[in-house]
From Swiss-Prot:
Keywords: Oxidoreductase. Gene3D superfamilies: Peptide methionine sulphoxide reductase MsrA. This is Peptide methionine sulfoxide reductase MsrA. The active site is at 12. One of its GO terms (biological process) is protein modification process.
Amino acid sequence: MATETAIFAGGCFWCMVHPFDQQPGILKVVSGYTGGHVANPTYEQVCSHTTGHTEAVEITFDPAVISYAELVEIYWRQTDPTDAMGQFQDRGDSYRPVIFVNSDQQRSIAEASKEKLIASGRFNEPIVTQIEAAKPFYPAEDYHQDFYKKEPWRAELGEVKRKAFIREKWSD
């Protein structure tokens, strides 16, 4: 089976795992860090805002079952694409919304999807989610992996603002 990877940053990585993890064709979702200038950063280093990293998820998927375009659509429905300085209660560069692309094809799909979202008029504010070339992805510490399964009540609490936003903007 041929597999591909997608990397999405949309705030706290804890909140970004579950929406993808539940989809057919998803083989693995890993929480981690990308986009910075320090190799193998720790959570504490990333939180210090000195490494340039963004919390993200790396998704391994079977493109015969789910397409990259479908993943991008799921991504939009999990984030506030108008907030460049974080997502919901999580603030700062390490929580900024970014689609990290692994190929020209992924870039083309992501850019077309972003243009479609802009043209939809769904949001009154500008769409500021960045589309950037993927950089090395470093898996986060084990206690961050599958957090929504390990600590469901904490994960749910962390998603209150996100879920309210999703209901308001994507309830169609």
